[in-house]
Each structure stands twice: as structure tokens, then as C-alpha cells.
């Protein structure tokens, strides 16, 4: 039992911090842990099929969103998505009303209500098309930067992107809208997706994150100067 206790003590010592070298290793480990707790972008590497354009674009979009939300601590605003969901909900409401009314009042008695619901549904689909084309555009993130003093309105950061079919050029645009002056500034880059993915289809954040940070910092510097 004594030998087991000694052995256990040695195991516990090696698991903790043994000597100067152990103390150094312990400190490094806790520092790294603190960094990962602060910014967990690299926790789960993103791996996709490089030949699937939608998967490539979605993975790049999601990772760019994470940089703004996790690294810069901005707060996501879901207003654009809520608007689209509201339009879709109203459209579904007309479809459900038509279904229930036709069940309760079989055709042709239900004809006027069915006609109204069908017309209303297609009108809402038209509104949805206009909304996604001219309001949402290709924006996939709207984030707010709170004013530390609480005196000025929030600054708004928007991310939008494009990747044409059968093309390897990915364009990411970052838009800054000043909460105080309402002035709008933009910065963007266009790069080959091969720069951001390795041969197995894993997104290399060490190559992608600096590009996003460079866009952000260029607009943030202009903001401070003005």
C-alpha cells in the first residue's frame, strides 16, 4: 500500500507541475486554455466537399460570421431574417386558411375564399422575392457594435458574399455604417477558394481569418480617424 501511495504521488506530481520545467508547462497550458476559452473559432475544423459550391460558400460565410461575433464580440441582429420569416409565415397562413375553408365548405362553395387565398399567397411570394433581392441582397450577417459610453447609437457591420457557379473566386464584402453619422463605408476582397482550403477540403482558418481581420481593421481605422 505504501508503494502504491508513493506511485500515486509521483503520478499526481507529473500530472500537475513538477519543478521549474513543470511550472513553465503548467503556465503555458493555462494561458493557451484561456485563449481558447476567449475565442473558439478553431475548436472544430470545417471540412467540406471542395466541389460543392454551396458548401464552400456556406462554410466561408459561417467562418467569417464567427470572426466578427467571437473575435470582435459584436452582437448579431436578426432583423433581416425575422422579416423573411414573417413574410413566409403570412404566406403559409393563407395556404392553411384555404385548406381548412375548403374542408369545411367543399368546392364550389369555397371558390371565392380559395381564389382570395391563392392570389394572396402569390402576392406574398412576390413580396418575398423583392425582399430577398433588394433588402437582404447577399447579406448573411448584420451585427451591432455597442457604444461603450452608451451615448451614441450602435455602429452596424454587415457581411455579404458571392461565389458564382463553376467559379473559384470568392468575394467577401464588409460594410460599416456609423451609428452617429449614418455614413457607410465598404471594403472587400476577392480570392480563390484554393487559398483557404487544403487538399482534403478542410478550411484553414490561419489563412482565412487574417483576410477578414484586415478588412475589419481597415474600416475600423477609418472610423477612428473620422
From Swiss-Prot:
Segments traversing the membrane: 87-107, 112-132
Protein family per UniProt: Belongs to the SPCS2 family.
GO biological process: protein targeting to ER; signal peptide processing
Subcellular location per the Swiss-Prot or TrEMBL entry: Endoplasmic reticulum membrane
Membrane topology listed for this record: Multi-pass membrane protein
Quaternary assembly: Component of the signal peptidase complex paralog A (SPC-A) composed of a catalytic subunit SEC11A and three accessory subunits SPCS1, SPCS2 and SPCS3. Component of the signal peptidase complex paralog C (SPC-C) composed of a catalytic subunit SEC11C and three accessory subunits SPCS1, SPCS2 and SPCS3. Within the complex, interacts with SEC11A or SEC11C and SPCS1. The complex induces a local thinning of the ER membrane which is used to measure the length of the signal peptide (SP) h-region of protein substrates.
Protein name: Signal peptidase complex subunit 2
Residue stretches of biased makeup (Gly residues): 9-25
Species whose genome carries this gene: Homo sapiens (Human)
Modification sites for N6-acetyllysine: 169, 191
Lumenal side stretches: 108-111
Ranges where the record places region Disordered: 1-25
One Gene Ontology term, aspect cellular component: endoplasmic reticulum membrane
Source lineage: Eukaryota, Metazoa, Chordata, Craniata, Vertebrata
UniProt keywords, alphabetically: Acetylation, Endoplasmic reticulum, Membrane, Transmembrane, Transmembrane helix
Function according to Swiss-Prot or TrEMBL: Component of the signal peptidase complex (SPC) which catalyzes the cleavage of N-terminal signal sequences from nascent proteins as they are translocated into the lumen of the endoplasmic reticulum. Enhances the enzymatic activity of SPC and facilitates the interactions between different components of the translocation site.
One Pfam family here: SPC25
Keyword Iron-sulfur: no
Residue numbers carrying N-acetylalanine: 2
Disulfide bonds: none
Amino acid at each position: 500500500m505504501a508503494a502504491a501511495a508513493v506511485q500515486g504521488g509521483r503520478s499526481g506530481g507529473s500530472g500537475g507541475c513538477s519543478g521549474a520545467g513543470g511550472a513553465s508547462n503548467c503556465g503555458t497550458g493555462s494561458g493557451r486554455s484561456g485563449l481558447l476559452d476567449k475565442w473558439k473559432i478553431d475548436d472544430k475544423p470545417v471540412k467540406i466537399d471542395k466541389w460543392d459550391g454551396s458548401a464552400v460558400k456556406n462554410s466561408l460565410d459561417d467562418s467569417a460570421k464567427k470572426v466578427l461575433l467571437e473575435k470582435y464580440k459584436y452582437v448579431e441582429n436578426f432583423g433581416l431574417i425575422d422579416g423573411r420569416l414573417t413574410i413566409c409565415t403570412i404566406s403559409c397562413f393563407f395556404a392553411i386558411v384555404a385548406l381548412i375553408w375548403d374542408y369545411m365548405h367543399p368546392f364550389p362553395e369555397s371558390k371565392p375564399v380559395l381564389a382570395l387565398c391563392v392570389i394572396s399567397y402569390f402576392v406574398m411570394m412576390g413580396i418575398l422575392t423583392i425582399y430577398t433581392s433588394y433588402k437582404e441582397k447577399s447579406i448573411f450577417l448584420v451585427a451591432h457594435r455597442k457604444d461603450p459610453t452608451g451615448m451614441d447609437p450602435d455602429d452596424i457591420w454587415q457581411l455579404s458574399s458571392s461565389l458564382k457557379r463553376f467559379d473559384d473566386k470568392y468575394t467577401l464584402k464588409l460594410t460599416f455604417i456609423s451609428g452617429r453619422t449614418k455614413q457607410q463605408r465598404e471594403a472587400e476582397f476577392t480570392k480563390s477558394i484554393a487559398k483557404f482550403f487544403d487538399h482534403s477540403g478542410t478550411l484553414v482558418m490561419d489563412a482565412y481569418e487574417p483576410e477578414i481581420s484586415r478588412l475589419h481593421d481597415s474600416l475600423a481605422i477609418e472610423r477612428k480617424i473620422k
